[in-house]
Regions:
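Canonical Rossmann dinucleotide-binding motif of NAD(H)/NADP(H)-dependent dehydrogenases/reductases
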Residues: 2-33, 199
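Active-site helix of classical SDR
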Residues: 152, 188, 196
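Residue(s) in the substrate-gating loop at a strand-loop-helix junction
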Residues: 172
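Alpha-helical segment proximal to the catalytic Tyr-Lys
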Residues: 157, 201-202, 262
Length: 278
């Protein structure tokens, strides 16, 4: 077991990729702290960990990573009850910045696809940036980028005690290629990549490694509401011809958290089925 007895905190682990990472880390022997914005969903992941192994137990802590006060309280609890932190996965994220975003994008996506399939012209424009509210922009940046910063800041204080640790930031293929239907999401994920590079240089002398994962389209509760038309288009654009599974991202995270990746820092790995090749 590559992570035996290490203390790992995974944010946004109530479902999807985060839950898969928490389960994989537990299988690898880690003591897993499961964070989610809702206590009940975090506890569901902890219960899943317990059902898989009597020797490994998880711990649920609810906190909104976009709130620095809640993040500070979460890490104080980690320090009090575990006394150390070896691994942090900044995974918490959202798909829409404001109510109605998803429906707007879905409607325009279907309209544009219908126009394309009909031979054009395409008269439905995205127009998302010019219509975006301050609320939508700040919420998206707040959860993804601010949350990554808040959690990393607190984690470094714990990891610096032993001059050892691994931080994994969840970026996205959107940071590499840009998504026309999600300018705020693309910006947040791009910021996470730049933050990863900078912090990796800053803390390398302490033996702390910082890397990122840039998943392609993964089958999770956050992506399933996409329109059938959009889902088919994504598969058509992906050379491997399918969506990824959360467990495939979890395997990547387990590698980066382990000593197998001891010479990796400031890097990004992108399991995306060939959607982006670069």
């Amino acid at each position: 077991m590559r992570l035996k007895d290490r203390v790992a905190l995974v944010t946004g682990a109530g479902s999807g990729i985060g839950r898969a990472i928490a389960l994989r880390f537990a299988q690898e022997g880690a003591r897993v702290i499961v964070n989610d914005v809702k206590q009940e969903t975090a506890q569901e992941t902890v219960d899943a960990i317990a059902s898989g192994s009597e020797a490994t137990r998880g711990r649920a802590i609810a906190a909104d990573v976009a709130d620095s006060g809640q993040v500070k309280r979460m890490f104080a609890e980690v320090d009090r009850d575990f006394g150390a932190l070896d691994i942090l996965v900044n995974n918490a994220g959202i798909a829409e910045g404001a109510p109605g975003d998803r429906e707007k994008i879905r409607a325009r996506s279907e309209a544009r696809m219908g126009e394309l399939m009909g031979g054009g012209p395409v008269t439905t424009h995205w127009d998302l940036t010019q219509e975006m509210s301050d609320e939508a922009w700040h919420r998206m940046i707040g959860v993804h980028l601010n949350g990554t910063f808040f959690c990393t800041r607190e984690a470094l204080s714990l990891m610096a005690r032993k001059n050892r640790g691994a931080i994994i930031n969840m970026s996205s293929v959107a940071a590499l290629m840009g998504l026309e239907a999600a300018p705020h999401y693309s910006a947040a994920k791009g910021g996470i990549l730049a933050f990863t590079r900078a912090v990796s240089r800053e803390v390398a002398s302490r033996g702390i490694r910082v890397n990122a994962i840039c998943p392609g389209y993964i089958d999770t509760p956050m992506t399933r509401p996409m329109s059938p038309v959009s889902q088919r288009l994504i598969i058509a654009r992906t050379p491997l011809g399918r969506w990824g599974e959360p467990e495939e991202i979890a395997a990547t995270a387990a590698f980066l958290a382990s000593d197998d990746a001891s010479y990796f820092t400031g890097q990004w790995l992108s399991p995306n089925g060939g959607l982006f090749i670069g």
